[in-house]
Regions:
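Single-stranded nucleic acid-binding surfaces, predominantly the OB-fold ssDNA-binding core
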Residues: 1-206
Length: 206
């Protein structure tokens, strides 16, 4: 039996302060913000963080530009968009959040234990860079629902996942939570820039 794990620790600057959200959950108050997290390379990830219940009172006192630490878990929910299509929203649900002085290097660590439920084909990018995508099913610690988390491996790690890990395998991941922009092409030829969120593997075990 899998001992599921789903933990995220982030620190960074609030690029957009917390705002009340409504529409998909009428039971508990929810508030969302955008957290900007710097990589060692200097590139910045902008990720959605969400507070619920009494934590919204703490979160909504924070201002844009504040440096904060967040501890939580990755969650997702499905909804019907204005286009009438089904969409999935991936975000970090906050268990703890606190304001602090800016660190020299932002924190970004994910710990996941779950099962592989989907495995994409190994892709090769320019300069022979390899990318392997998988979907990992894990649990939300404070909910009974599953979370199906997009995960990517790059370079030699991608080859390792491709050759040694298959659907239904239990996998233990240490990684980084990141945002990635891409262009979606529709049947009518129209292209739209969108953002997806995923875990990039830095270490894995079975």
């Amino acid at each position: 039996m899998i001992s599921y794990r789903n933990e995220v620790i982030l620190s960074g600057t609030l690029a957009k302060k917390f705002e009340y959200q409504q529409g998909y959950d009428q039971v508990r108050k929810k508030s969302e913000a955008i957290l900007e997290v710097r990589r060692k390379s200097g590139r910045k990830d902008q990720v959605i963080i969400q507070a619920s219940g009494w934590k919204t009172e703490v979160a909504e006192k924070l201002q844009e530009g504040d440096y904060v630490y967040v501890k939580g878990e990755i969650r997702m929910y499905g909804y019907i968009g204005e286009d009438g299509e089904k969409h999935t929203k991936i975000y970090v649900h906050i268990d703890r959040i606190w304001k602090d002085v800016a660190a020299e290097q932002d924190s970004n660590e994910v710990k996941l234990v779950g099962a592989i439920v989907k495995k994409a084909a190994l892709r090769k990018l320019p300069k022979a860079q390899k990318i392997q995508g998988i979907t990992v099913a894990t649990k939300c610690c404070s909910q009974s629902a599953n979370a199906y988390i997009p995960v990517v491996a790059q370079g030699r790690m991608a080859s390792r996942v491709c050759e040694n890990y298959d659907v239904r395998y239990e996998i233990r991941i240490t990684g980084r939570y990141q945002s990635r922009n891409y262009k979606k092409k529709y049947p009518n030829g129209k292209k739209e820039e969108k953002t997806t969120y995923e875990v990039s593997i830095t270490k894995l075990d079975i």
